[in-house]
């Protein structure tokens, strides 16, 4: 308990008495934060311990490759050969850590409102998009964990049923199978996006785990599946001082990164897309909408 007080998790009254503080209360109110604390005090610290060693030994070779980050280099240094060529998520899976990580992803360290509420606050009209009858599939949530975001959408737009909402995940949890259409998809293999012409393809905190090359590969797969009326909605943190530590963590663990408006537009152009809406709040997930090149009026809406 004394150590916990030193970390600020509880308040120290005297050498035998401790008191709940706002951090303690937050951990109770947002239980997923406990899993987040576990992961953000293990994987990133492990990787950071070998960051300078890898840079020095490789003559500062950078950017990292996704399976050749300081995470894998650390296991190479201690001769844990089974992890040396594995992706960080694969290592976590092999170590039995993914159930805890999935629990963290359900609520993270706290939420900035539901997805429908958040995009509405940016001035984005999701309701109008979902009213289209161009395709029966309203939203495909790629890498959407257990489907929490789709359930938020379903609650906000009750006309949407199971057959309208597709969750795509690698080795998906079937927890919400009664509410959502669940598909297994490893977007990192060579298989294409199987759902063609959905109204929305949504990705929340997916691209920041990917190197530029891998992010572009995924973006191109989705672009190939999109129809002229389709939209790709990207929910990511803004590249600002608030998320500098997150940016560094993504580099160390996955060779990923947080991206700016300029970088999103560059990637969109390479995938045959264009940015048609963007919002970058100081804190919380922003929103980037992309559509097929030439299907909009050629201007990008930027939320204030």
Regions inferred by a protein language model and the residue ranges of each:
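Short, cationic-aromatic polyanion-contact patches
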Residues: 14-37
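Core SAM-dependent methyltransferase catalytic element
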Residues: 272-304
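A short, conserved structural fragment
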Residues: 5-17
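Short, hydrophobic-biased segments on the C-terminal half of alpha helices
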Residues: 1-2, 265
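Eukaryote-biased feature marking scaffold/signaling PDZ-domain proteins and nuclear chromatin regulators
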Residues: 5, 259, 283-285
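Conserved adenosyl
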Residues: 30-234, 238-243, 275-276, 280-281
């Amino acid at each position: 308990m004394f150590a916990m007080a030193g970390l600020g998790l509880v308040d120290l009254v005297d050498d035998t008495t401790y008191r709940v503080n706002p951090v303690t209360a937050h951990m109770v109110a947002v239980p997923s934060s406990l899993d987040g604390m576990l992961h953000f005090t293990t994987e990133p610290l492990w990787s950071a311990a070998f960051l300078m060693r890898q840079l020095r030994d490789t003559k500062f070779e950078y950017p990292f490759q996704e399976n050749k980050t300081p995470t894998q280099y650390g296991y190479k240094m201690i001769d844990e050969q089974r992890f040396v060529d594995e992706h960080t998520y694969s290592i976590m899976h092999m170590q039995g850590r993914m159930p805890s990580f999935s629990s963290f992803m359900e609520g993270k360290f706290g939420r900035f409102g539901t997805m429908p509420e958040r995009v509405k606050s940016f001035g984005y009209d999701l309701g109008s998009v979902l009213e289209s009858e161009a395709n029966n599939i309203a939203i495909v949530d790629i890498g959407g964990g257990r489907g929490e975001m789709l359930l938020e959408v379903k609650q906000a737009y009750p006309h949407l049923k199971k057959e309208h909402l597709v969750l795509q995940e690698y080795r998906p949890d079937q927890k919400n199978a009664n509410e959502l259409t669940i598909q297994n998809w490893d977007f990192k293999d060579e298989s294409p996006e199987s759902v063609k012409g959905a109204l929305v393809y949504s990705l929340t905190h997916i691209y920041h785990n990917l190197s530029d090359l891998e992010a572009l590969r995924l973006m191109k797969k989705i672009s190939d599946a999109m129809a002229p009326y389709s939209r790709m909605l990207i929910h990511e943190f803004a590249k600002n001082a608030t998320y500098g530590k997150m940016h560094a963590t993504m580099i160390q663990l996955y060779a990923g990164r947080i991206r700016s408006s300029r970088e999103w537009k560059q990637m969109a152009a390479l995938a045959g897309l264009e940015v048609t809406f963007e919002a970058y709040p100081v804190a919380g997930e922003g929103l980037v909408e992309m559509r097929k090149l030439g299907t909009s009026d050629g201007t990008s809406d930027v939320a204030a």
